[in-house]
Amino acid sequence: MFNFITFILFAVVCISYCHKSRGRRHFGDEYRINTPACDIVCEGQWKSEFHANFHKIYDTEYFEIPLDTAIVKNRANLKMFCSSTIQKYSCLRNECKIQRTPWSAEKHICVGHFDNFDRNINCLSLTDKYVQRECSNVCNSIKIEISQAEIDRMAEMDFSRQEKSEFVEQNKHCNVIACYQLCHEYIISKVCIDSAVAARSVVKSYYDSYLEREYTELNKDDQDELYSSFCRRVTPGQDENEFTANMTRYNNLTLDRMKNDIRSVFSILD
């Protein structure tokens, strides 16, 4: 049971600090419709436990993309993280009476797919050093461009400067996410021979769900036109040609370029 008296002061701090998280992390605003403080206490306790367990500040030192070393280092870390996460959702449900919560990375790992992560933790642990080093080197330096067709579409739709900026940033984000997914799946195939299929499925499910959340956030605000063709290409259930026609070849070339860069970095393992 969460100690609300102990953490109410922490909640006040969280109002001004904890919510200054990176844009890609979403703690649903709908939580605060009827319970403006209760959910913050649950979240604050969870982040406090994360810091105590892993000696990292969640909002600034934990990364959802790629999967953070703190979570996949070993089975003990995974279970410790998920035990605290399950407590958080129990707090939201029992103390705050919040029965429905949106997708989040920790919810995906610990509530929706814990058994899959647990079964494949050895492979995730073995590949983590490559993901954090080599994959990061590749994915943080990939060539990211906007097609001329989409530049023309933004002009035709009279995008504002802010909308253009958001479009470009979202496209970059999708490129980086897709790169990490491809890279992680590639290294799994090289390192985890016996469990490669299952481990790749775990990674694919995580990244697919992450991208689905990205689209949902834009669509919720009626801004899905800011989701680029490439973003739609790598997001399950989306049509890459919905807003800009004949983008398949361009997106194929983008993905092929990523795959070639990844293969080049890991050629020593071939």
Curated annotation (Swiss-Prot):
Glycan attachment points: N246, N252
Signal sequence segment: 1-23
Places the protein is found: Secreted
GO cellular component: extracellular region
Disulfide bonding pattern of the chain: none
Domain of life assignment: Eukaryota
Keywords on record: Glycoprotein, Secreted, Signal
PANTHER family: PROTEIN CBG02791-RELATED, PROTEIN CBG10961
Listed name of the protein: Uncharacterized protein B0403.3
Species for this entry: Caenorhabditis elegans
